[in-house]
Amino acid sequence: MKTDAIELGVAKDSTPIGGANRGVSILDFILRLVALVGTLASAILMGTTNETLPFATQFIRFRAEYDDLPTFTFFVVANIVVSGYLLLSLPLSIVNIVRSTAKNRRIILIIFDTAMLALLTAGASAAAAIVYLAHKGNTRANWFAICQQFNSFCERISGSLIGSFVGVAVFILLILMSASALSRRN
């Protein structure tokens, strides 16, 4: 009797595929919320970053703002676009919880998740390179580190990278989970 069950692939203790996919869909929704909070916080933190040095003269003021560098502007725009996508994908994720056997919706999410992963990775990596230069400088190119003077500015731009890279990690997990759920269905 047991050999027949093994040969047919039927087991009494196995979980139904719909139940496992529902759990994946719930985790998908939670991870999307985590990524939304991280990317939105990163965009807000970077977008509101500025610092003016206290020893400004009558004619010269030393000020650092995020939009002084196009890389930081790209970082903010990339995080806002990804946050908007995550907000718009939440209803689709809820539909996947209710109807966990929806293959087409999951494929659409994988495609757009991959595009958003690429955008977010590009923005976070470019900003990380500039943050590194702000902290360390580059003596060969005569780029001096500015973080000794603009301490608060550097702390904020460094902190804004954390949420963005958390978003990158979450997108990788989302893509792997969705691909795994699709492969179990076939």
From Swiss-Prot:
Tell me the residue ranges located in the Extracellular compartment per UniProt: 47-73, 128-156
What biological-process GO terms show up in the record? cell wall modification; cell-cell junction assembly
> Its principal location?
membrane
Bilayer-crossing regions: 26-46, 74-94, 107-127, 157-177
Does the record's keyword annotation contain Cytoplasm? Answer: no
Glycans attached where? Answer: 50
- UniProtKB keywords: Cell membrane, Cell wall biogenesis/degradation, Glycoprotein, Membrane, Transmembrane, Transmembrane helix
Cytoplasmic side residue ranges read 1-25, 95-106, 178-186
Query: Which cell locations does it reside in?
Result: Cell membrane
Q: Which InterPro entries match?
A: CASP/CASPL, CASP_dom, CASPL
Membrane topology for this entry? Multi-pass membrane protein
Q: Do you know which Pfam families this protein is assigned to?
A: CASP_dom
Quote the NCBIfam families the UniProt record gives.
A_tha_TIGR01569
What this chain does, per the entry, is described as:
Regulates membrane-cell wall junctions and localized cell wall deposition. Required for establishment of the Casparian strip membrane domain (CSD) and the subsequent formation of Casparian strips, a cell wall modification of the root endodermis that determines an apoplastic barrier between the intraorganismal apoplasm and the extraorganismal apoplasm and prevents lateral diffusion.
Which family is this sequence assigned to? Belongs to the Casparian strip membrane proteins (CASP) family.
Please state what the protein is called. Casparian strip membrane protein 5
Species annotation = Ricinus communis (Castor bean)
